[in-house]
Structures are given as C-alpha cells and as structure tokens.
C-alpha cells in the first residue's frame, strides 16, 4: 500500500504523510477473537509511573493473533485484511476448511482469497508456515520462533523480516534486520515472506495530536528539567547537560549496552554491533 500526502490546507496537514489503507476492511473485528484492553497510563498496580510519557489515546480492543500456527495441514482462506491498533503490521482474518476463524500477521503480497497452510511439507509462498529445517536456504521469513512451540517472536513488526542463510548441526542460521546472525533450532516454525506495511517507517504525523491519539505524551528532555528532576537539569540558560547521557536515575544511556543474558550468547554468531558488510 502506498503513502498518502495532503494539500497544506491546515498546519497539521502540511507535513502529514500516512499509509493509504483503502484496501483494508472497514468494519469491526470478529468479536470472539477480541478482548477488552484497559488503559494503564504507564502506571503499575501500585499506581506509580513505571513507563514515562504514556497515557490517553483512543480506546482499543485487543485482537488475538495466532503466532503459533498450531492448526497443521489444514487449508485456510484469507477472508480480509484488517487494521490492528495494537501493532504496526496489518493482520489477516483466515477461515480454515472446518470453519474456524483466526487472525494471523499479514505478510506482503498476501491478498483476499489466497490460501495459506501450516505444516511440515508445504509450498514456500507468503503466509505458509513450516519448520526452518524444511525451508530452502535464502528464504525470507517472519514470525520466527526462538523455542519450538513457543510462538513467533522474531520479525513481527511492519516491514520486518529475517533470512535463512544456512544450517549447522540441527540449527538454522538466521540473519536479522539488525545485522545480527543467530542460531535457532531447525524444528522452530516460521512464516514465509516479509511482514506487511513496509511504508510504516516513512509516515509523518504532521502534528502532536496524532501521537496523543496513540497514547504517547510529550517526551521531555533531561536538560529542560530542574536539577531535582534529572541529573542533566538546571544551569543558567541552555546547557548541554555537562556529562555523558544518563537516565533520570543516573544510569548511562544512549548507546550503553545492557545485554546480560550470557546463557544465550552461544546462539549469537555475529552481534548487531559489528560493522555490517
């Protein structure tokens, strides 16, 4: 789907660039595949702010998206493509041959009326899910499991994909969008194709209100605060903060590496920090 620009009839429309969504379904989602979602405003169960700059926004209902594709070797037909306010990608409503309805992440080049299936020996075409061990090397994939049966975790946002670049001793070698190369079990399932809505990265909200509609509040810089509120705060006139960037609690930020999961280091063949070639 293409990008849509507007005539500058108002200041908010002058810079506005959105994704043209005329091909998506305009009705309500399937009720049995949705559930209520309460707005947290960035607060935890004690009422304390644990995630700053969140709150407000339009009311949402959560769509149950099938990341596991456990219904194997049963053909399903794409009924429609839908907008999902809870993620950047579009979702597809599929109807299995036995009549069951389900939502899946919509890959690029998947249209209404197309057939999809999950299984061990299925065709390599967008929307079909299969184990990494049964895919040809070089396949573009998304919604990749990290543990067999756990459900897809890698490459789920708009336009994202990973590539199967090799196999080694029962493991599949994946190249991710970030440049990282990592090992995943060959029995893990993945879906063929790249995630829909690749133009999401090119949108321009045009005005602050569009961010507020999504539940995002203004992101205040530390140097604009008082010393009581932030380590970068205070000073006469505008200052640069006077030290390396830190969080409001004094921890280094902006590029400081925080990964500490040594147990899974052995699965990362090439980190995303190494220069991409």
Curated annotation (Swiss-Prot):
Residues 222-277 are annotated as: Disordered. The keyword rRNA-binding applies. PROSITE patterns: RIBOSOMAL_L2. It holds the Pfam family Ribosomal_L2. SMART domains: Ribosomal_L2, Ribosomal_L2_C. One of the primary rRNA binding proteins. Required for association of the 30S and 50S subunits to form the 70S ribosome, for tRNA binding and peptide bond formation. It has been suggested to have peptidyltransferase activity; this is somewhat controversial. Makes several contacts with the 16S rRNA in the 70S ribosome. NCBIfam families: rplB_bact. Belongs to the universal ribosomal protein uL2 family. This is Large ribosomal subunit protein uL2. It comes from Bartonella tribocorum (strain CIP 105476 / IBS 506).
